[in-house]
């Protein structure tokens, strides 16, 4: 029989057969609020859709819906997070710094952690050659380092897209963790050609775009899903 291709990044491990897991402070559960701050090219490249595109360019409706998030939605959410004293992990396209840097500044001033999220969500990382991808990662790192005064350590790929070399390139670029893989409830060390990088879970079930736009979940049900996920993870 044909041998199936494997990724070779980590071995199989049943969560029921592992030793007890605890964070350095002794806590059993860690929570992060991941807020994606994304910028898209106008009338070219990829983009999330509120409604199916007509195929005619420019697709003003869907572009404007995405831009609403940077102009209005991000500010409404910042006010909510601050009212709840809730820290945020801000997953930032590097092109945001050229478009609306004041949004990043406001979140940074509120105590948000800045996580690299590629250059733009108008392109998929996995479509690049290895040299193109390495150059993109390096460019994003330089842009965030210049803006934040420190090199980013975490990464989420645009569209959660990877090439076969992405973990290797991220490790070589100085990243210590990334969020692309949703294969576990616990952080998992993944092999690269130069060492290890930590995979931090990024659960798709409580991601608003798949839940609300794809599966047509109501806002109330989505909120219940987040609460139920937290309660179940805490119980486990």
Feature map (PLM): residue ranges:
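Catalytic alpha-helical scaffold of carbohydrate-active enzymes acting on polysaccharides/glycoconjugates
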Residues: 2-198, 222-236
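Positively charged, amphipathic and often flexible ligand-engagement surfaces
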Residues: 185-187, 199-221
């Amino acid at each position: 029989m044909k041998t199936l291709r494997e990724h070779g990044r980590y071995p199989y491990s049943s969560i029921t057969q592992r030793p007890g897991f605890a964070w350095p402070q002794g806590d059993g559960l860690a929570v992060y609020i991941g807020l994606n701050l994304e910028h898209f090219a106008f009338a070219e490249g990829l983009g999330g859709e509120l409604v199916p595109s007509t195929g005619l360019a420019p697709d003003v409706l869907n572009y404007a819906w995405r831009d609403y998030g940077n102009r209005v939605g991000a500010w409404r959410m910042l006010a909510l997070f601050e009212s709840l004293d809730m820290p945020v992990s801000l997953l930032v396209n590097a092109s945001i710094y050229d478009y609306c840097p004041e949004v990043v500044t406001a979140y940074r001033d509120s105590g948000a952690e800045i996580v690299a999220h590629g250059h733009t969500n108008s392109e998929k990382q996995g479509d690049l050659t290895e040299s193109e991808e390495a150059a993109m990662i390096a460019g994003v790192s330089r842009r965030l380092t210049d803006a934040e005064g420190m090199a980013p350590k975490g990464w989420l790929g645009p569209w959660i897209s990877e090439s076969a070399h992405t973990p290797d390139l991220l490790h070589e670029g100085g990243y210590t963790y990334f969020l692309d893989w949703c294969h576990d409830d616990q952080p998992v060390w993944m092999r690269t050609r130069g060492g290890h990088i930590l995979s931090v879970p990024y659960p798709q079930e409580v991601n608003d775009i798949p839940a609300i736009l794809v599966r047509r979940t109501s806002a109330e049900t989505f909120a219940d899903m987040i609460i139920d996920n937290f309660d179940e993870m805490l119980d486990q």
